[in-house]
Amino acid sequence: NGNLLDNKYIPRIGDNDAAKTVESVKSFDAVGADKSVIKLEYSAPAGAEGRIDYVSFTYNRKLVMQNNFMAFRTGAMKYAVSMQLENATSDIIIWRRSADGECTIIPSEYNDGVLTTYSSNIKSNDELIAVKRNANFPEPQVVDNVSNQNLHSLGHTDMVILVPQSGKLTAQAERLAELHRDADGLNVAVVRADMVYNEFSSGTPDATAYRRFMKMLYDKAEPGKEPRYLLLFGDGAWDNRMKTSEWRGENPHDYLLCYESDNSESKVSSYVMEDYFGLLDDTEGYNLLKDRPDLGIGRLPAITEAQAKAMVDKIVAYSGRKYAGDWKNSILMLGDDGDNNIHMRDADNVAEKIAATDSSLYVNKIYWDSYKMEVTASGNSYPTVRKELLEQLQTGALLVNYSGHGSADVLSHELVLNKGDMSALVSS
């Protein structure tokens, strides 16, 4: 109520931490106040980055029924106790929710506005919820009708193309599907994401629904006729729920979901991987870094129909040999510097496996540590790496694979490649 109760400092998060929890216990006198208003103000110094997950406010008070339902906890208890709920009505029941999620009704007795409970089953820190059975509670609202569908009835399917719910990309996805049907003889199914959610995650958008859908097709297929390809025809967002300021203005129906590692709060140990959707054997999915996908997975990161059309146009041209050339036999491997050469070694391991798999492919290697680094007041740079990389990209390559640091805007700390460079490349 206008009085400062406490100042709490949240320490910085270390490299191996994901979050910090701050607790505070304060006593204050609210005598004479009909209502106590607790206000939380959060500020951070310039350059600091942090997001509050939740604030928990716990206090002791008399058990007086408020509104149509009221949740409270038992606190620490050594013995079985009875509790009295004042301002009660005869239609109130009390539910107990244990730590493991079990819900039971607590026996009680009503007498003249007081509800008394008697139960030896109430434990320390149980959550109790008093509910007026005859009260008017909000009712579920109809959001939309779900049309009849049956993805489980799909037969032999070589390729699945998933498209966003909005349907903006469906026409171009069908165009690409027709190309693969005619040119490659594949059985292709174009499926909207919301249809997958309806059958594999109870209508809730969930990236794992994509995997469950593919596993259904995988398990029911005859030997040798399992799905071979999954194409995610639509862009993704690191904020799947689009709750952050960066994504709040976007329409989630224009995007497909991403699978993110459990440790998604870490800038080092978190990652987005599409391979997850292809781990289809019964024993797979627990060790994501070692399990191997059972089909090829790709994504066309289109948001608008114009972007989708440009991508499909390029695939059609590629299929028709319009841009035939020796670049189709060229592989470009890129390896960042630092970190005890781990990025260069990773890139080289992949390069050697590619060379051993297909002798018709020529592997070009650009490893940062093989070039001279220039040190200036504005930072470190690799001018020769940048020059050779841009030349290789302009010439063309079947595959460009980079191992190292970067972001959505630049490649490596030395800013070897940026978005503007990619926009300047012209097909010839």
Regions found by a protein language model. Give the residues of each.
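Cysteine-dependent hydrolase recognition
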Residues: N1-S428
